[in-house]
């Protein structure tokens, strides 16, 4: 029992810790103690009855909580021992644990509920046993559902669960120890089981299988806490004030396999800024939102509490082999296969599963707010201020009333939350699996809190599961696993390669592009109240995250362009509707709001480019009005934050100058001229002062800046910008290496790039576009740089380690080859691109798609995803299409009626000697 006694003392002391530190500092500052050893004096002082009495009078709330907590802990241990003695024979038979020979009792460090109840770990000579002070009906129900699924014979390996004994409102569970695997085969079976388990939990709408609830035991995962087995969100959602499409997106995410929390949780939809996923949550992560606290200078009068970056606690959820972590990302195919097999078994067992649910008399836990939110309140409430004054403590917790609807049910619910927090407990809500009421803190029922029961929700949800749902979930599993990729992590234990999604493509390039478009449409998020669509996708900010597709040109803008030009060249109206629906989805999700960022690939100029293409292809002049009014609002924001303007092609003024100068030759809008003038002055000022970042390359470096100056100089006739363009070329060419026939990459890693974004191909492309502009038509340096770009593109543009992306992959190489071919009239370069397309289409079918951000799924991103592949295939089939990475502008011929007629993209035709 020594362990429980030690915990007992530590538990009580932790409640008073911050208050005791305040006390010792107050006495130190007031000079109460003459001795130098202030800490020892304080320690002795706090042991006297008189001091304790005064302390209790000063902090009455703390005094009450400590004694209340002590009584609860004694009762908890008593209940545990009584349960063991009362059921010793069943415990021996089920677990082989001898209750007459008990050693230590350890109370878990987890949350306290329902009068201080916590999990207790009991150790003895015969093993270890887990006491749970709540019903284990969810575990028993899951076993029933698991058995039903396994009877179909579709799941290859057993899905073992921890043994349990349930006795009403408490029970006992087998203690599972973490074990490594010894072989790759065992790891494969482990991750197959993860996939299969995730399917069953997904079908039951379980949503709390985070890293603390999984234990790796060799090739078998065990789930040690299923109290939230079935989710019920039949009550009106907290997202009721959100835009309808955003509500639909969040609901789809919650009801997906990722809603179980088993897979990596790197997403913009989750409450935390670190990954709590069941198979991936690791204490190696740090948080910017959440803090960790530790004692410093213990045993001295300088004792204090310091805060640091929040970290996850140690757990047993990560799989190891020979001391190395077996990373789940490399076992995506095993997890997907397990998920598919088990979910197909679920589909075949729907009626039996629903019967099992309907016959259950058990309860499940309802999590009505994130537990971490309650924890934050208790953390604040541990301040001496809230220990002195009960009224202040009640006022603090009453902030939970803020923002709720005014119904009696919600007031009752929050009252129960406040009551639990006042007792230093995390509020605990339960619901019968076949009931609508919720029970708060084991002692108060709120009738008809929900409009349906958890089993009703499962019945409704499981009825919708079909092959299409399974396919969508496998895509999400891939995206989620991709978000866990860490290039700095230790290599894969068994030497595996990252798995890729395979796509079958027709040999006809237009048809192949259309097949990709059809796959995108089939996986789209569909609004319930409109025709709007979007997608889940992988975004890259600091790390890969799951997000909803934006229509920035670097991301979803390419998908809009693909659909528009599929409509142009196939004549199928569904593609025009699809393009319009993506745009309406972006508007509903708030992606089309005016912004100060008027860059091309990440800002407002890209959105204008999309509307421009709608105008060019449909002749609908309302798009011009939309552009005009939108940019006027952007201009206001731009003037409010002029220092936020960046420099480069991707996200800065250079992209703005190239895109808007070209479009305004056709649109002739005053607002564009004003934006161009501000952008040009900003970029010129920074360039002349040497403040632009010293980088080579088109996307982020001198090549893009040179093109921007040249474009604006040609547009305005201002020779200042033509001269600045020439200067930028000269600065970049200082870094040309004759030996490598390439420009040095000035980023940290150094080397020589061979991509659109970095290296000779993109630099040559920028020079190619400068060649037709005023002051550079007969420039020999420009002509020579173009040839250098083509040379490296042909020599290195199809390296074996390249991905398939448009930004820095093989399809970017093909796209640039086509642009070069169009410009110089080279059938040879075009044939090289077409031939390469055939090879890489076959590679995508046989080996899988290599995304541009180490993703494993065919996401709808234009520059890094499968959309870029489809768009490039369309360009190879129809070379007159505008190149996205060259910011080509379709020319518009105005008719006498004021409408527009579209002509093919302007071709930069000239000869290079």
Task: Cite the ranges covered by each PLM segment.
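CBM-like carbohydrate-recognition segments
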Residues: 805-807, 825-913
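C-terminal catalytic region of ATP-dependent kinase domains
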Residues: 1-18, 22-26, 31-32, 38-81, ...
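Low-complexity, Ser/Thr/Pro/Gly-enriched N-terminal "stalk/linker" regions
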Residues: 482-555, 562-565, 569, 573-574, ...
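Long, well-ordered core segments of solenoidal/helical folds
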Residues: 513-531, 574-594, 622-643, 674-692, ...
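Solvent-exposed loop and edge beta-strand segments that line ligand/cofactor-binding
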Residues: 539-557, 588-604, 639-653, 688-703, ...
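Well-ordered alpha-helical scaffold segments within catalytic/enzyme domains
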Residues: 263, 497-504, 558-572, 591, ...
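Conserved ATP-binding subdomain of kinase catalytic cores across diverse folds
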Residues: 5-65, 69-206, 220-222
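Hydrophobic residue at the +6 position relative to the catalytic HRD Asp in the kinase catalytic loop
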Residues: 212-214
């Amino acid at each position: 029992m020594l362990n429980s006694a030690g915990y007992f003392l530590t538990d009580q002391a932790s409640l008073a810790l911050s208050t005791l530190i305040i006390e010792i500092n107050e006495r130190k500052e007031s000079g109460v103690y003459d001795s130098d050893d202030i800490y020892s004096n304080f320690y002795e002082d706090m042991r006297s009855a008189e001091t304790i009495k005064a302390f209790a009078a000063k902090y009455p709330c703390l005094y009450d909580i400590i004694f209340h907590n002590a009584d609860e802990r004694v009762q908890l241990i008593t209940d545990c021992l009584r349960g063991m003695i009362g059921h010793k024979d069943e415990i021996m038979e089920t677990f082989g644990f001898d209750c007459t020979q008990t050693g230590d009792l350890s109370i878990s460090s987890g949350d306290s509920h329902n009068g201080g109840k916590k999990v207790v770990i009991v150790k003895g000579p015969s093993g270890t046993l887990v006491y749970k002070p709540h019903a284990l009906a969810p575990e028993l129900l899951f076993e029933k559902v698991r058995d039903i699924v396994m009877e179909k014979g579709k799941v290859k390996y057993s899905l073992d669960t921890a043994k349990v004994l349930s006795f009403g409102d408490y029970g006992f569970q087998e203690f599972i120890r973490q074990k490594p695997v010894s072989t790759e085969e065992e790891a494969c079976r482990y991750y197959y089981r993860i996939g299969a388990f995730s399917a069953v939990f997904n079908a039951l709408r379980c949503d709390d299988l985070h890293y603390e609830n999984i234990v790796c035991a060799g090739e078998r995962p065990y789930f040690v806490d299923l109290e939230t087995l079935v989710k019920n969100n039949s009550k009106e959602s907290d997202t009721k004030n959100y835009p309808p499409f955003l509500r639909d997106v969040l609901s789809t995410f919650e009801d997906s396999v990722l809603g179980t929390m088993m897979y990596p949780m790197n997403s913009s939809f989750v409450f935390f800024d670190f990954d709590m996923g069941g198979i991936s949550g690791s204490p190696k992560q740090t948080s910017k939102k959440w803090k960790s606290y530790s004692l410093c200078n213990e045993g001295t009068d300088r004792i204090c509490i310091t805060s640091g970056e929040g970290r996850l606690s140690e757990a047993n959820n990560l799989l190891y082999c020979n001391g190395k972590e077996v990373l789940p990302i490399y076992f995506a195919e095993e997890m997907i296969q397990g998920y598919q097999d088990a979910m197909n078994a679920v589909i075949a067992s729907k009626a039996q599963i629903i019967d099992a649910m309907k016959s259950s008399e058990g309860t499940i836990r309802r999590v009505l707010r994130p537990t971490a939110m309650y924890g934050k309140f208790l953390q604040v409430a541990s301040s001496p201020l809230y220990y002195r004054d009960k009224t202040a403590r009640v006022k603090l917790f009453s902030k939970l009333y803020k923002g709720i609807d005014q119904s009696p049910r919600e007031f009752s619910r929050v009252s129960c939350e406040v009551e639990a927090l006042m007792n230093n407990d995390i509020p605990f809500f339960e619901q019968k699996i076949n009931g609508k009421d919720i029970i708060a803190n084991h002692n108060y029922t709120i009738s008809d809190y929900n409009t349906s029961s958890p089993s009703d929700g499962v019945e409704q949800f499981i009825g919708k599961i079909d092959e299409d749902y399974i396919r969508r979930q496998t895509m999400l599993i891939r995206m989620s696993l991709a978000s866990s990729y860490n290039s700095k992590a230790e290599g894969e234990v068994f030497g595996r390669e990252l798995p890729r999604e395979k796509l079958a493509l027709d040999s006809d390039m237009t048809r192949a592009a259309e097949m990709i478009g059809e796959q995108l449409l089939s996986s789209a998020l569909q609004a319930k109240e409109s025709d709007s669509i979007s997608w889940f996708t992988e975004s890259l900010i600091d790390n890969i995250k799951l997000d909803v597709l934006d229509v920035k040109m670097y991301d979803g803008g390419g998908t809009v362009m693909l659909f528009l030009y599929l409509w142009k060249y196939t004549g199928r109206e569904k593609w025009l509707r699809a393009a319009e629906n993506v745009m309406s989805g972006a508007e509903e999700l708030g992606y089309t709001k005016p912004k100060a960022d008027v860059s091309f690939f990440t800002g407002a100029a890209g959105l204008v480019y999309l509307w421009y293409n709608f105008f060019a292809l449909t002749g609908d002049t309302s798009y011009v009005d939309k552009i005009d009014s939108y940019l006027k609002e952007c201009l206001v924001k731009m003037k409010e934050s002029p220092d936020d303007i960046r420099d480069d092609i991707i996200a800065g003024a250079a992209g703005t100058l190239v895109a808007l100068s070209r479009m305004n030759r056709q649109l002739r809008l005053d607002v564009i001229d004003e934006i161009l003038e501000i952008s040009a002055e900003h970029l010129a000022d920074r360039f002349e002062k040497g403040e632009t970042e010293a980088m080579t390359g088109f996307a982020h470096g001198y090549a893009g800046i040179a093109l921007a100056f040249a474009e604006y100089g040609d547009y305005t006739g201002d020779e200042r910008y033509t001269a600045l363009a020439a200067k930028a070329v000269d600065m970049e060419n200082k870094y040309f290496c004759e030996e490598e026939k390439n420009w040095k990459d000035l980023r940290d890693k150094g080397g020589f790039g061979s991509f659109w974004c970095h290296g000779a191909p993109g630099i040559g492309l920028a020079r190619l576009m400068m060649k037709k502009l005023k002051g550079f038509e007969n420039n020999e340096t420009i002509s020579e740089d173009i040839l250098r770009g083509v040379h490296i593109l042909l020599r290195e543009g199809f390296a074996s380690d390249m991905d398939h992306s448009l930004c820095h992959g093989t399809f970017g190489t093909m796209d640039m080859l086509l642009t070069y071919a169009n410009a110089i009239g080279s059938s040879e370069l075009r044939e090289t691109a077409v031939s390469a397309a055939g090879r890489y289409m076959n590679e995508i079918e046989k080996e899988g798609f290599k995304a541009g951000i180490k993703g494993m799924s065919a996401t709808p991103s234009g520059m890094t995803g499968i959309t870029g592949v489809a768009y490039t295939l369309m360009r190879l089939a129809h070379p007159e299409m505008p190149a996205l990475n060259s910011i080509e502008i379709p020319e518009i011929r105005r008719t006498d009626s004021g409408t527009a007629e579209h002509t093919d993209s302007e071709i930069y035709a000239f000869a290079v000697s």
